[in-house]
From Swiss-Prot:
Protein name: Large ribosomal subunit protein bL31
GO cellular component labels: ribonucleoprotein complex; ribosome
Cofactor binding note: Binds 1 zinc ion per subunit.
Native source species: Ectopseudomonas mendocina
Highest classification ranks of the organism: Bacteria, Pseudomonadati, Pseudomonadota, Gammaproteobacteria, Pseudomonadales
Cofactor: Zn(2+)
Function, as annotated: Binds the 23S rRNA.
């Protein structure tokens, strides 16, 4: 989702989701 706008967010989003 946010990874589309912020590639760096993908790392934070994945952690919070707890998924890859």
């Amino acid at each position: 989702m946010k990874a589309d706008i912020h590639p760096n967010y993908v790392e934070i989003d994945a952690t919070x989701s707890x998924g890859n």
